[in-house]
Amino acid sequence: MGLEKSLLLLPLLVLVLGCVQPSLGKESSAMKFERQHMDSEGTGSSPTYCNQMMKRREMTKGSCKPVNTFVHEPLADVQAVCSQEKVTCKNGKSNCYKSSSALHITDCHLKGNSKYPNCDYKTSNYQKHIIVACEGNPYVPVHFDASV
């Protein structure tokens, strides 16, 4: 009797796992933003910061990402930008917001002679306003548009 129940429940289990599984490994836009742009604990002060972080945050897999910015502020402060000054995004969309104050950021630029898989970055630290695109519910950053 136990075996019959197990055999009857197996197709149901397969069906449920088939529906749930595809979403398990999928990184949301908000999670991708955090992985690619947030470093609340860091300062970016080391000359090798960008080389280390770009690799650690998986932005040198398959190719070298040419430019990236890390924000060294609490996540809540960056999320709050989504309720600050509304501006037009570089792509013309209207879901971008500019921070009301300058934030501590690190820009990483791929050096001209650098070739994959040896991605070599120039590290530059700034205090600048950031512009982020926001989406979702809750309304959170999903794209780093610029720093000004």
From Swiss-Prot:
Write out the GO cellular component annotations. extracellular region
- Give the E.C. number(s): 4.6.1.18
Catalytic activity field = an [RNA] containing cytidine + H2O = an [RNA]-3'-cytidine-3'-phosphate + a 5'-hydroxy-ribonucleotide-3'-[RNA]; an [RNA] containing uridine + H2O = an [RNA]-3'-uridine-3'-phosphate + a 5'-hydroxy-ribonucleotide-3'-[RNA]
Where expressed (tissues)?
Pancreas.
PROSITE patterns on file? RNASE_PANCREATIC
**Which residues are noted in the entry as substrate-binding?**
32, 35, 65-69, 90
Disulfide pairs here are: 50-108, 64-119, 82-134, 89-96
The active site consists of 37, 143
Query: Which InterPro entries does the annotation name?
Result: RNaseA (IPR001427), RNaseA-like_dom_sf (IPR036816), RNaseA_AS (IPR023411), RNaseA_domain (IPR023412)
GO molecular function terms attached to this record: lyase activity; nucleic acid binding; ribonuclease A activity
| Signal sequence range | 1-25
UniProt KW keywords? Disulfide bond, Endonuclease, Hydrolase, Lyase, Nuclease, Secreted, Signal
Coiled-coil annotated spans? none
UniProt-annotated location(s): Secreted
Say if the entry is tagged with keyword Nuclease: yes
- What Gene Ontology biological process does one annotation of this record name? defense response to Gram-positive bacterium
First-tier enzyme category under EC: lyase
Q: What does this protein do?
A: Endonuclease that catalyzes the cleavage of RNA on the 3' side of pyrimidine nucleotides. Acts on single-stranded and double-stranded RNA.
SUBUNIT field = Monomer. Interacts with and forms tight 1:1 complexes with RNH1. Dimerization of two such complexes may occur. Interaction with RNH1 inhibits this protein.
Similarity comment text for this entry: Belongs to the pancreatic ribonuclease family.
Query: Protein name, please?
Result: Ribonuclease pancreatic
The gene behind this protein is: RNASE1
